[in-house]
């Protein structure tokens, strides 16, 4: 079957043969007992937020895996598909003993099937079965969770939805976190996901619909999880959602007397309402209670090495050989061309494409050092085995892939990493870990000022009046960059102006719902000879571009208008028209008209506002 070959052997041209990656049989017949690729499906394990999860085993090795079946309809617009598949491939690089591994991705016409590590139990079922959990035992689970979360944050992935269903246990009672990186894929481009999965575990800034949900939201959820393990009940729990939201927003909960001072102190610092004052993951790792009996392999490299870094002068760090083996791994996993990877690593240019490659390289490099750590830590040999079996053996096609061909080796022998990459590695604590941080996103969803909108805003019942939202940071010294247009006018006036401009330009829009007053969904006819698509020999022209315009509050009395491309429709009402184009065609096709129309709109707005 050509499917798995596709993953390991394609290079840079991988998006052109879009059919190459499809499984021949239609996968929606994913009945129990059927086969997908090399996997035999056994039964359905459950229904996740993204679709069904099935238990399966690899036909030759018998290894158990779980298949997470994501229906492409749930994902963003078809023209985002390529990016989503790219993000899912990035998740394949995440290797941490306490994160569910993603072994492979199988694509069919309607689904993306993620082949992931199988862990049979949920942590919380285990807690319920034990009548009492000692602090030692709870701390061991907590250390594993925090170490995994730190690892993902370091690689710029925030979970955003840590809750009991995502905390699994393997047969050695080790925690495995599921769904890392998925909330991203679901929300991308629409700054917010309105439904937050389980409100009991959600941070105040998440339930109040604040725009920016950074790594701090995971700290809050971990605080709730620690509380539940130690107290066997939820810190925030109420029949009434408004009351629940009010308690979370105000951080109202009680700590039982039996907790040790160390534990209750840590919980208090994690459940701080203002995300800026909340403890960071790195600070948790330095907490005294946390550090008791901490397994060596759970401490990230940089925390161990920090002291040495501080002593060294920066210069001698800068020369570092590029690891050829890692380049090979990278080109296999992500489908980059090897030369492309060397180019990115040697260049000091700051382009998105280069950064993507550098991040992936650093990620693989970290995996290596993590494995080295685990080898030194004698207690974890069995864990190491499961950690290293990156995927069912048959996936390691033939050994040739791992050895760079000789001439390739000669060509690149002793190549040097551009110093900027090394520096990034040496001081790679991401900006959000920096304690001196002053800058932070102050974008928030618009407070509602009209009575009928207030009613519609179901959250308002239980939340402090939205108008009290004040900017988190009022430091004015630094120029801020924003996408879209900024405005200091009254929000309703801004919306009015936009509607007038759209009307003048002949665009149409959907009637906004009361909850969604600050979002305009626009369809705009774009006439151009290039917008012809040939489909089944018939010319169809997708000439209606969809744009979403959204108004956000950046600071008090300072608003931002955001424009987002939202796909094409043809006048025939057949919105599926774009799916036959490859992702490349789609993106080259859409960028220019989108910029063209938004520029027209911005000009129109400028003309109008001067006229007033």
UniProtKB/Swiss-Prot annotation:
Output the Gene Ontology cellular-component terms: cellular bud neck septin ring; nuclear envelope lumen; nuclear membrane; nucleotide-activated protein kinase complex; vacuolar membrane
Q: What class of enzyme is it?
A: transferase
Could you give a single Gene Ontology term from the biological process aspect?
establishment of mitotic spindle orientation
According to its UniProt record, where is this protein mainly located? nucleus
Q: Name one Pfam family in it.
A: AdenylateSensor
Q: Per UniProt, what is one GO molecular function of this protein? A: ATP binding
Identify the Gene3D superfamilies for this entry.
DNA helicase RuvA subunit, C-terminal domain, Kinase associated domain 1, KA1, Phosphorylase Kinase, domain 1, Transferase(Phosphotransferase) domain 1
Q: Does the keyword Disulfide bond apply?
A: no
Q: What's the Enzyme Commission number for this chain?
A: 2.7.11.1
Q: List, as start-end ranges, the regions of compositional bias called Polar residues.
A: 388-399
Q: How does it sit in the membrane?
A: Peripheral membrane protein
Q: Which residues carry this modification: Phosphothreonine?
A: 194
**Protein kinase domain boundaries:** 39-290
Which residues are ATP-binding? Answer: 45-53, 68
Q: Which parts of this chain are annotated as the region Disordered?
A: 1-25, 388-426
Sequence intervals crossing the membrane: none
Q: Where in the cell is it found?
A: Nucleus membrane
Which intervals carry biased composition (Basic residues)? 1-18
Location of the active site: 161 (proton acceptor)
Q: Which reaction does it catalyse?
A: L-seryl-[protein] + ATP = O-phospho-L-seryl-[protein] + ADP + H(+); L-threonyl-[protein] + ATP = O-phospho-L-threonyl-[protein] + ADP + H(+)
Q: Extract the SUPFAM superfamilies matched here.
A: KA1-like, Protein kinase-like (PK-like)
Superkingdom per UniProt: Eukaryota
Question: Which family, according to the similarity comment?
Answer: Belongs to the protein kinase superfamily. CAMK Ser/Thr protein kinase family. SNF1 subfamily.
Provide the function of this protein.
Answer: Essential for release from glucose repression. It interacts and has functional relationship to the regulatory protein SNF4. Could phosphorylate CAT8.
Protein name in the entry:
Carbon catabolite-derepressing protein kinase
Q: Which organism is it from?
A: Candida glabrata (strain ATCC 2001 / BCRC 20586 / JCM 3761 / NBRC 0622 / NRRL Y-65 / CBS 138)
Its taxonomic placement starts with: Eukaryota, Fungi, Dikarya, Ascomycota, Saccharomycotina
């Amino acid at each position: 079957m050509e499917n798995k070959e596709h993953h390991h052997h394609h290079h840079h041209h991988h998006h052109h043969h879009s059919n190459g990656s499809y499984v021949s049989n239609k996968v929606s017949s994913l009945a129990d007992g059927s086969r997908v690729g090399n996997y035999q499906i056994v039964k359905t394990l459950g229904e996740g937020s993204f679709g069904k999860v099935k238990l399966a085993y690899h036909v030759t090795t018998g290894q158990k895996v779980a298949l997470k079946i994501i229906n492409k309809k749930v994902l963003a617009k078809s023209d985002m598909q390529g990016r989503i598949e790219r993000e899912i491939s990035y998740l394949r690089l995440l290797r941490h003993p306490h994160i569910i591994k993603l072994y492979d991705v199988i694509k069919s016409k309607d689904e993306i099937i993620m082949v992931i590590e199988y862990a049979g139990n949920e942590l919380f079922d285990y807690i319920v079965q034990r009548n009492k959990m000692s602090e030692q035992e709870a701390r061991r689970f907590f250390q594993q969770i925090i170490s995994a979360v730190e690892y993902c944050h370091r690689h710029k992935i925030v979970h955003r939805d840590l809750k009991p269903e995502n905390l699994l246990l393997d047969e050695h009672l080790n925690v495995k976190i599921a769904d890392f990186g998925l909330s991203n894929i679901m929300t991308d481009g629409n700054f917010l996901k309105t439904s937050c999965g389980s409100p009991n575990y959600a941070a105040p800034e998440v339930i109040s619909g604040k725009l920016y949900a950074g790594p701090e939201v995971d700290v809050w959820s971990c605080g709730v999880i620690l509380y539940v393990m130690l107290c066997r009940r939820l810190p925030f729990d109420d029949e009434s959602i408004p009351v629940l939201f009010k308690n979370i927003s105000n951080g109202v909960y009680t700590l039982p007397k039996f907790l040790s001072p160390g534990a209750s102190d840590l919980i208090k610092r994690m459940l701080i309402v203002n995300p800026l004052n909340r403890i960071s993951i790195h600070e948790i790792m330095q907490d005294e209670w946390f550090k008791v009996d901490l397994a060596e392999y759970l401490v990230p490299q940089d925390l161990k090495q920090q002291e040495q870094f501080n002593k060294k002068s920066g210069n001698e760090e800068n020369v570092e050989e590029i690891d050829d083996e890692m380049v090979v791994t990278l080109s296999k996993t992500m489908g980059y061309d090897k030369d492309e990877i060397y180019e990115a690593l040697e260049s000091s240019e700051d382009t998105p494409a280069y950064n993507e490659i550098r991040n992936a390289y650093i990620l693989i490099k970290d995996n290596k050092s993590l494995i080295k750590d685990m080898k030194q830590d004698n207690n974890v040999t069995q864990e190491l085995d499961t950690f290293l079996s990156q995927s069912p053996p048959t996936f390691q096609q033939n050994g040739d892939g791992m050895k760079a061909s000789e001439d390739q080796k000669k060509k690149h022998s002793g190549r040097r990493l551009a110093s900027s990459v090394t520096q990034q590695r040496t001081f790679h604590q991401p900006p959000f870990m920096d304690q001196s941080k002053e800058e932070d996103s102050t974008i928030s969803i618009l407070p509602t000022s009209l009575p009928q909108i207030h009613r519609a805003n179901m959250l308002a019942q239980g939340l402090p009046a939205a108008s009290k939202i004040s900017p988190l940071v009022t430091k004015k010294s630094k120029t801020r960059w924003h996408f879209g247009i900024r405005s200091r006018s009254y929000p309703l006036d801004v919306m009015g102006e936009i509607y007038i401009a759209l009307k003048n330009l002949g665009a149409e829009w959907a009637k906004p719902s009361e909850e969604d007053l600050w979002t305009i969904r626009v369809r705009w006819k774009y006439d151009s000879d290039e917008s012809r698509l040939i489909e089944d020999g018939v010319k169809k022209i997708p000439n209606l571009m969809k744009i979403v315009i959204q108004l956000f509050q950046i600071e008090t009395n300072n608003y931002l208008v955001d424009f987002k491309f939202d796909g094409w429709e043809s006048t025939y009402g057949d919105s599926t028209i774009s799916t036959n184009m490859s992702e490349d065609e789609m993106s080259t096709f859409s960028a220019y008209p989108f910029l063209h129309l938004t520029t027209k709109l911005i000009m129109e707005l400028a003309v109008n506002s001067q006229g007033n």
